[in-house]
Amino acid sequence: MPERGRVSVPVGPAGVEAGGGVTAFVVRAVALLCALMTERSSVAELAGILREEVDRYSPGERLPSSRRLVERYRVSPVTVSRALAQLAAEGVVVTRPGAGAYRAEPSGPATPAPGDTSWQEVALSAQTAAGPVPRSVDASGVLVTLAEPPPGVIEFNGGYLHPSLQPERALAAALARAGRRPGAWNRPPTDGLPELRSWFAREIAGPGGEGGPTGADVLITAGGQSALTTALRALAPPGAPVLVESPTYPGMLAVARAAGQRPVPVPVDADGLRPELFAAALRATGARVLVCQPLFQNPTGAVLARERRREVVRIAREAGAFVVEDDFARSLAHEDAGALPPPLAADDPDGVVVHLRSLTKITSPSLRVGALAARGPVLERLRAIHVVDQFFVPRPLQEAALELVGSPAWPRHLRAVAAALRPRRDHLAAELRRQVPALAQAAAPRGGFHLWVRAPEGTDEAALTGAALRAGVAVTPGRPYFCAEPPAVHLRLGFAATAGTAEITEGVRRLRTACAEALPHGAGGGEPVPA
């Protein structure tokens, strides 16, 4: 290896080459620059050679001295010193002042990639019950999002739009126009107003409309929760297993349990429901119903990946099972959501999918108007359950809904909400990273009302949510979102029910105080980070 890094240029008192002038000074500067570039190249080259040679030595064994390396590779001492420093920074060697360089001791065994234990959620819940499944009515998971927080408490647990985001003027105008319609207070058709059924059918079918439901396939319901209750009662008898996403909306679990059904979890990842575990759950339980939220799933915000969409419907069709598609968040897309995938029901000629949606989330908690869409004989069973449960949805509400969605204010409202939710989402995510980095976030969803965060291992969920409420911020515990043992402690943090970004900042500050009290020691949950 030729000698590099040594350049000798005699310099006179004036800083130029002895006996020269400006030309000699330029020559010297160029020579120095070339020397610097050559030196850097030599360091990298020597480090590469030594990196291979060090494997010949045992851990802890001394390498040749710097002098020997200078002689062997014909480089400068500076080059040797820098190459060894680079290898020390990489953990290949250890340098000891005055004693030389040694091969580094091997580090501990690499941490193996975590295994995937998601299948256990299916296995632990798949056993056939020895007797009838007891009916249980537990509304605690639902009441968390419905209860009014105490005065002064910031609402991170809300499931509806803040009043400032609701279309109050448009709703008032729609109600006024609806009240003037002929027969507004007469009894409506039990299936719903034909015009409203047709509007929902067009929304489900999307542009083009081929392959989607028609108005005759739609039933008007008193909101999404009512539609879900009707669907589960119609599709699964008491004692039957019902496949659900894990985690999932507590209100759905409450409906299934109240009907005496047995929820069986199918895990969700970043791309939505996992088809292979869905198929495994069908085989293990004999279930004939899956309830899923393919778009901005509650609580994870996941969107069912394109390649999984057809797979889920195919698996269900081959098993003779129904897919209940809860499309609650289609109107809750954020400004940066891009083009949304169509509903599963938009291309379902075989009637596998029972679709439900609602106007409530995008308007007001009190506009409880939704829809069920299905094809084939199942529609008759849905209709029968629907009539027995509620007769019909009050006509003034249906008329008001028609007036609202048919007004110029409707598309403006959708755009306004999309524009308002994105900065709230981004601000909450940023404040959590800044103030409470111990709460791990997945990728922020581009639709819906909330973030799903994981607390450090060892966190007491009840203690954390209690501490948050004492600090002045209401958060939603994650445990009610699982029908089997949860894999970790989670919180659902909403941003749509807040007044704006300033309130979000204050809410996270209060949550940081709660984390300092309730997170395991050393979790780093309560340390303020400068803005």
Model-derived segments and their meaning:
Residues 338-360, 380-381, 491:
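Conserved active-site segment immediately N-terminal to the catalytic lysine
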Residues 373, 452-454, 494-496:
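Short hydrophobic/aromatic beta-strand micro-patches
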Residues 1-176, 383, 387, 393, ...:
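N-terminal basic, amphipathic alpha-helical segments
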